[in-house]
Amino acid sequence: MALDIHAHRILILDFGSQYTQLIARRVREIGVYCELHPFDMDDEAIREFNPRGIILAGGPESVHEANSPRAPQAVFDLNVPLLGICYGMQTMAEQLGGKVEGSDLREFGYARVDVVGKSRLLDGIEDHVDGDGVLGLDVWMSHGDKVTQMPGNFNILASTPSCPIAGMFDDARGYYGVQFHPEVTHTKQGGRILSRFVQDICGCEALWTPSNIVEDAIAQVRQQVGSANVLLGLSGGVDSSVVAALLHRAIGDQLTCVFVDNGLLRLHEGDQVMAMFKENMGVKVIRADAEKQFLDNLEGEADPEKKRKIIGRTFIDVFDAEASKLDNIQFLAQGTIYPDVIESAGAKSGKAHVIKSHHNVGGLPEEMNLKLVEPLRELFKDEVRKIGLELGLPYDMVYRHPFPGPGLGVRILGEVKKEYADILRRADHIFIEELRKADWYHKTSQAFVVFQPVKSVGVVGDGRRYAWVVALRAVETVDFMTARWAHLPYDLLETVSGRIINEIDGISRVTYDVSSKPPATIEWE
């Protein structure tokens, strides 16, 4: 009988915290499957999900305000272990008969909590011990309210001077609440705390591993697709590359990929994609050389959003044209990943603040009467990368820096021209090459060059040169929501600048972008 890697599962209910997806990623890193659902998930759905444990995540609301969110009753009726984090602890306390009040002293940022009670959750977990033998944890707090009275049968787990009940527990039921955030890296022992809850208290085994995920995905694809043929738009990005490798292993020649070369890719990227998938792996790949079509459609357009829409529409036109030449295609594969699924669900429920639109396939499924196959839809981005390595894709491909869907089209400020794209891709190649040589590529989260359509005077030999300006951009970030500019060594910047100006005709000046996000975005357009 095949291993059911979803058998041991954790349910995470989202009350609106910015950290909720991070909780899910931490649970997955432990090797346990989990799903994230809105706080108002109905009782029947919770019972059908049949979790081994439930985590109530944080949120921005106050439990003593009217209409603030509450956990469904099924959470308490299932008799499974429960962990409330921040707001999750507060609503658990209030719903079970305790009291929550606003605090005069809010806690935001680093804090030290004293471990007061002896519980299964924190037994043997500490950062330091003071002279009186009191155990302490270094944690990350983010709360304005606090529990002032615990429900019956609960004991104090942890405390701070301004928040005497910074944690509470009922070992008999496996109910725990912590006012701090174990999911963030600032809480040093957070990983151990979550592992203790998920594995030891909930009894979940580590079945969610890259090798098991690959085997399960292959079995699911074969069951869904059977002997039918599948079409995939291959971009060379991480998600579509992993889908291609996974589907090829699962169904072989039943997969056909269409690679649209829009003339806005990185240096040699089209050839590299073809070499990797067609020549090395034997995947059926059709290369559509559409540079002229994209550049013609972009001619005269300088507005960033309009450029994006033109590139998106042109991609669909080219992809449609290639797909219409193929016979007997029943399925369209997509690189949908779990955050896309979460956002879509949030959009439908009206709870999402940000809605991402995916234009990569347009109306193709409906027009061609195709069914969707989405083998990555349960996975976070970091899991997709691990799956890529498990499937044998090169590390440098799997851990390549993000590249925008419109490509160089949004790294050329203003109108896009072939001359600009050719200059930019060479400059970008030099920057990335030198980052790799200096062992800085993987220390940065994203690095690239921006073409600015302004000219600056320069001196070459005995003559003056009036040529274009480019900007180097390199950032460090954990989640791409915030980012700081990378403090690259001056000698590295000097080497990059010297090579770009000396090796590329048409560039007279190189600048370095020292803007962080916020207020600046990572990309310039």
From Swiss-Prot:
GO CC field: cytosol
Xref: InterPro entries: Class_I_gatase-like, GATASE, GMP_synth_C, GMP_synth_GATase, GMP_synthase, GMPS_ATP_PPase_dom, NAD/GMP_synthase, Rossmann-like_a/b/a_fold
Active site: 86 (nucleophile), 181, 183
GO function terms (MF aspect): ATP binding; GMP synthase activity
EC id: 6.3.5.2
Catalytic activity: XMP + L-glutamine + ATP + H2O = GMP + L-glutamate + AMP + diphosphate + 2 H(+)
Pathway: Purine metabolism; GMP biosynthesis; GMP from XMP (L-Gln route): step 1/1
List of residues binding ATP: 235-241
Subunit: Homodimer.
HAMAP family in UniProt: GMP_synthase
Job description of the protein: Catalyzes the synthesis of GMP from XMP.
NCBIfam families membership: guaA_Cterm, guaA_Nterm, PRK00074.1
Name of the molecule in the record: GMP synthase [glutamine-hydrolyzing]
Gene designation: guaA
